[in-house]
């Protein structure tokens, strides 16, 4: 108690010193609080998907480097040949800006191309309507899934939004699903999203550009079966890679590398945050 009274007397006699001390404490406490919020959000908070520990990130790896992307034909082959996963989905490596027509003026929104059942793979069902099915994976498909924000802002949260039309890049699409509020695709920290992804369009796997194996532009995500291990799934994918290399010589230096989804998303920032917290 005596020390506290002495400290108050010192600060009363030296207001400038007191201001510096208070400012330093305020900055230190604020920085610590902010850093804890970042660490809690990145490292401690579970991924916003059902049973995220079963989710696996798959990316193409060559002898000399990792490409982090897979070609559409390879995705189709892996999806049809593997039995280690409940489901296997894919999405474009980055979203793209599209123009959506409105009554007032055209609006620019972010859209991502995704495969059938990607939302189901993540364990997040649309709040209304359905996920994409394989029949949607064609150039002629006009199905679209919209975000909760688009449903609210552009359709007023209408109960009958499923089946309504929306014009995207001068093409008329039919809304087949609405994602829950707060849903995000698992882009890793190498993709800096300046705007949320509000539209989800189906991959057109029969498009001529999607038939070229040397064009790698997909990210693959799988949900392991309950009885499967990551090691066994990796071994099975290695076997499929060798089978494909025997048919497609350009694939002879290529294979899939599997890592837990959480490790891929937060792995590269974990050491930096740990150092900052320690300091």
What are the residue ranges of the model-derived segments?
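Residue-level recognition of transmembrane alpha-helices
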Residues: 21-24, 170, 279
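N-terminal Sec/SRP start-transfer signal
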Residues: 1-27, 268
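Generic recognition of well-ordered alpha-helical segments
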Residues: 2, 6, 13, 41, ...
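N-terminal membrane-entry
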Residues: 265-279
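Loop/turn elements at helix/coil->beta-strand transitions in domains of secreted/extracellular proteins
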Residues: 53-55, 84-87, 173
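Alpha-helical transmembrane segments
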Residues: 27-54, 61, 72-75
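Extracytoplasmic/periplasmic
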Residues: 61, 65-87
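Mid-to-C-terminal secondary-structure elements
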Residues: 96-97, 110-133, 142-269
